[in-house]
Amino acid sequence: METPLKAPESSLGSYNEPSSRTSEQDVATQELANQGEEILSQLYRPLETCNNKCFCKGCCFHCQLCFLNKGLGICYDRKGRRRRSPKKTKAHSSPASDKSISTRTGNSQTEKKQKKTLGTTLEADPGLGR
């Protein structure tokens, strides 16, 4: 009679195994969920400064900031370091507007023609009194 009693015990043990498997699966899914949350928290964490000056492969890829700075060469430093030149006064621009377009562009042929016509008119006029 011992044999029938042992059979139900082994059958109870077989029922316990699937439940233990499901509990292991639950633990595994919880671990994956925790890892996913940790990855997301790392993704949205602000970039921190790294004092490592090494450019080896391990140091270039150990954090997102080093990957951007060392691996890709992208540096998001302050842009306020550039100094602008002082604004020029408008006194220089007014004489340029007084000049004709031909002198600003470098076309001096019109000036030569004007000088020749002025020279011929001066030579043709004998003067007022002499």
From Swiss-Prot:
PTM description: The phosphorylation by CDK9 does not seem to be important for transactivation function.
Residues annotated with Phosphothreonine modification: T89
Biased composition (Basic residues): 79-91
Feature: compositional bias, Polar residues: 11-29, 92-109
Keywords for this protein: Activator, AIDS, Host nucleus, Host-virus interaction, Phosphoprotein, RNA-binding, Transcription, Transcription regulation
Subcellular localization(s) per the UniProt record: Host nucleus, Host nucleolus
Motif extent (Nuclear localization signal, and RNA-binding (TAR)): 78-90
Annotated GO CC locations: host cell nucleolus
InterPro entries (UniProt xref): IV_Tat, Tat_dom_sf
Superkingdom of source: Viruses
Annotated segments matching region Cysteine-rich: 50-66
GO biological process, one term: positive regulation of viral transcription
GO MF annotation terms: RNA binding; RNA-binding transcription regulator activity
Complex formation: Interacts with host CCNT1. Associates with the P-TEFb complex composed at least of Tat, P-TEFb (CDK9 and CCNT1), TAR RNA, RNA Pol II. Interacts with CCNT2; the resulting complex is unable to bind to TAR RNA.
Entry comment, domain topic: The Arg-rich RNA-binding region binds the TAR RNA. This region also mediates the nuclear localization.
Known function: Transcriptional activator that increases RNA Pol II processivity, thereby increasing the level of full-length viral transcripts. Recognizes a hairpin structure at the 5'-LTR of the nascent viral mRNAs referred to as the transactivation responsive RNA element (TAR) and recruits the cyclin T1-CDK9 complex (P-TEFb complex) that will in turn hyperphosphorylate the RNA polymerase II to allow efficient elongation. The CDK9 component of P-TEFb and other Tat-activated kinases hyperphosphorylate the C-terminus of RNA Pol II that becomes stabilized and much more processive.
Sequence similarity: Belongs to the lentiviruses Tat family.
Name the UniProt record assigns to this protein: Protein Tat
Organism encoding this protein: Human immunodeficiency virus type 2 subtype A (isolate SBLISY)
Gene of this entry: tat
